[in-house]
């Protein structure tokens, strides 16, 4: 059953870091930058026809929120990004 975004952030797991690593190049290309720091901190998820992951990522410039869609048995793809976030900023749907 599909639904809303999970209410509380979850600490990033190795699986979430792997998803984050998979879309790093997509994000760098989109933003025209290269990151030496790209660490998943926490995330929320939303079950759709696949899974949306809303991930707080620590970067060289602070924190970004990225939205990644992963189809069932598919490859993760970057959907969107919110830049200039802080560690304290809540992860919300975007």
Curated annotation (Swiss-Prot):
Signal sequence annotation: none
Alphabetized GO MF terms: cysteine-type endopeptidase inhibitor activity
Gene Ontology terms: cellular component: cytosol
Keyword Ion transport listed: no
Coiled coil: none
S-S bonds: none
SUPFAM superfamilies the record matches: Cystatin/monellin
Record site: Reactive site: 3
Major localisation: cytoplasm
Intracellular or extracellular location(s): Cytoplasm
Alphabetically ordered keywords of this record: Cytoplasm, Protease inhibitor, Thiol protease inhibitor
Secondary area of contact, short sequence motif: residues: 46-50
GO biological process, one term: regulation of protein metabolic process
Pfam families to which the protein is assigned, alphabetical: Cystatin (PF00031)
Domain of life: Eukaryota
PANTHER family: CYSTATIN 14A, TANDEM DUPLICATE 1-RELATED, CYSTATIN FAMILY MEMBER
Family: Belongs to the cystatin family.
Function in brief: Intracellular thiol proteinase inhibitor.
Protein's name in the database: Cystatin-A3
